[in-house]
Amino acid sequence: SGDYSGQNIRDYLSAIDDVAKEPWVDKDRLGCVGASYGGYSVYFLAGHHDGRFKAFISHCGIFDFEAMYGSTEELFFLNNDYGGPYWDKQNATAMRTYANSPHKFVDKWDTPIMIITGELDFRIPYTQSLEAFTAARLHGIDARLVEFEDEDHQVMKPQNSVVWNREFFGWLDKYLKK
């Protein structure tokens, strides 16, 4: 698309602002969750949400665009979505994309985050999740890493799904439930 961190992020924030105006929504107990591209969105929004969210959960999200470029098995995706490689300084689309990599905004993170990943993920390598978890912890953010050694981009094994759901909803309960 060439518009990572662009219109979609503005749409997310506009949508949550509109939803938060509804009388049945407690704007002080909003969470933000996403997987894959949604997981990337969580990382980006963690540095740009201006207090809207009280908890984040990212499942297999992209955290560092440059590291991702050299470690995924799907370069055609990144060449299309990012606009090209990070070393192509003449490519304005690519440079705009890399300038907005979520890892560059960790200094603005201030909200608890759970990070879920599968060690067998070749689409978005689990090291992306490890980097985000480490950054959050070093920045003093309450963070939890849930890592499945026998899963890839999706959690498919029934016993792991039970753990995934327990962890996911436990995190939301911890930070959003009254």
Predicted regions located by residue number:
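Active-site-proximal cap/loop segments of hydrolase catalytic domains
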Residues: 1-178
